[in-house]
């Protein structure tokens, strides 16, 4: 499969390791690359180290099509993550993007400065549905807040910035938030974070299964929502920014769907617990060849003309 240019760097293929537990430290990043990831998005880092929510923090209902997680943004803080990235770079020549979260523009600015000259780019996490008051989706549903945060990070960082969007808003708000991020200097949009929060109850204890009570929904059930968000963003902003799709991707067919919807690249999280990134990349390459595409970039947005036409019939699109 042909390499792709994403966020200012050459990726061997369009499939990256999403921000999550696997990319919380150097050994996990190395594991992801050895299993074929073309790029790494680190576990989200906050200004100070966090222990996160009490366990359980992840519950697997993949036999029902989804998983729930409520990590609570556990991380070692920026000083330690900088060391983890630098040690990783000593061994691997693979793009690394730092995922960061704070409770306002000043915090994002400080984090951006901390990773300047270290990470190849930033991903601003303004979309976690269970991070706690003042963080995550609470910020990411407010276009004005997203604009201020993005501008602060862009000014302080020496590379490209992507804003990770929440699916927990209506279509109009989604597009307003995306426009605010782009106007403030974002070069990419990552879509989407987990959906929710959701709840499961243990029948034996009559208590929530997750330690935090509620958590974000990931896995295959998230994919139709993520695809729709990617397609909506591509219709409105595909000429202006790169779009990175994430949510429910398990195999090559899923990747090609996201490419068709307008994503330039994708991230894999939940499925990486059981399947190698390289296997998904190989499947993607075979499917693209079967469909007559020489590479992934030729497939980007293939479904958008018909998607636009069908939205017109609903009165949702010009």
From Swiss-Prot:
A Pfam family it matches: DHO_dh
Subcellular location: Cytoplasm
Active-site feature positions: 128 (nucleophile)
Top EC class of this enzyme: oxidoreductase
GO cellular component: cytoplasm
Amino-acid positions noted as binding substrate in the UniProt annotation, renumbered to this chain: 43, 69-73, 125, 193-194
Pathway(s) of this molecule: Pyrimidine metabolism; UMP biosynthesis via de novo pathway; orotate from (S)-dihydroorotate (NAD(+) route): step 1/1
Cofactor note: Binds 1 FMN per subunit.
A GO molecular-function descriptor: dihydroorotate dehydrogenase (NAD+) activity
UniProt binding sites for FMN: 19, 43-44, 125, 164, 192, 219, 247-248, 269-270
Catalytic activity line of the entry: (S)-dihydroorotate + NAD(+) = orotate + NADH + H(+)
Record keywords: Cytoplasm, Flavoprotein, FMN, NAD, Oxidoreductase, Pyrimidine biosynthesis
InterPro entries: Aldolase_TIM, DHO_dehydrogenase, DHOD_1B, Dihydro_DH_chainA_dom2, Dihydroorotate_DH_1, Dihydroorotate_DH_1_2, Dihydroorotate_DH_cat, Dihydroorotate_DH_CS
Keyword field contains Magnesium: no
Stored CDD domains: DHOD_1B_like (cd04740)
Gene Ontology biological-process entries: 'de novo' pyrimidine nucleobase biosynthetic process; 'de novo' UMP biosynthetic process
Cofactor(s) the record lists: FMN
The protein's assembly and partners: Heterotetramer of 2 PyrK and 2 PyrD type B subunits.
Function: Catalyzes the conversion of dihydroorotate to orotate with NAD(+) as electron acceptor.
PANTHER family: DIHYDROOROTATE DEHYDROGENASE (FUMARATE) (PTHR48109:SF1), DIHYDROOROTATE DEHYDROGENASE (QUINONE), MITOCHONDRIAL-RELATED (PTHR48109)
Family the UniProt entry places it in: Belongs to the dihydroorotate dehydrogenase family. Type 1 subfamily.
Protein name: Dihydroorotate dehydrogenase B (NAD(+)), catalytic subunit
